[in-house]
Amino acid sequence: MHLTLFKELLKQPKPKFHFEIEPNVSFLAVEEGPASLRSYSIGNVSRIYDGIRVPPKPEEPLNCCQSGCAICVWDVYADDLEEYNRARRKAKRHYLDKHLPVPPDLAKVSLKETSSLEELPPQLKAFVLLEKRLMKDKQSKNN
């Protein structure tokens, strides 16, 4: 009985969308900060849409110390979020250009280039912008 059911399940048609799930992969360069500054839930994995890799959606950090670190977890989060959104736009554009059906999880992706900081709550957006400005000021003083 169970063997017959299992064989029937194996005969199920495959989905029409071309994407694969791969283990979590770090997408930022090593000099931008250690991977320990990032946090992902189990199951939050990178995907490949018809050959285009989309990193896992970054999660808001819970471990910011608010002391002005050289590499703040919020800076890493903002950069990861920007890369995530850029990759999703690229994947959706690829499907549209090839006149392929767009996967449901890319259907609501806007092709308009916007700052990923717009997705943050206003207080966090202001904090991240302040951190980035302070980091630029610090770098310009060192040069």
Swiss-Prot record:
<feature type="domain" description="Oxidoreductase-like">
    <location>
        <begin position="48"/>
        <end position="93"/>
    </location>
</feature>
<keyword id="KW-0809">Transit peptide</keyword>
<dbReference type="GO" id="GO:0005739">
    <property type="term" value="C:mitochondrion"/>
</dbReference>
<keyword id="KW-0496">Mitochondrion</keyword>
<dbReference type="Pfam" id="PF09791">
    <property type="entry name" value="Oxidored-like"/>
</dbReference>
<comment type="similarity">
    <text>Belongs to the UPF0651 family.</text>
</comment>
<protein>
    <recommendedName>
        <fullName>UPF0651 protein P31B10.02, mitochondrial</fullName>
    </recommendedName>
</protein>
<dbReference type="GO" id="GO:0016491">
    <property type="term" value="F:oxidoreductase activity"/>
</dbReference>
<dbReference type="InterPro" id="IPR039251">
    <property type="entry name" value="OXLD1"/>
</dbReference>
<dbReference type="InterPro" id="IPR019180">
    <property type="entry name" value="Oxidoreductase-like_N"/>
</dbReference>
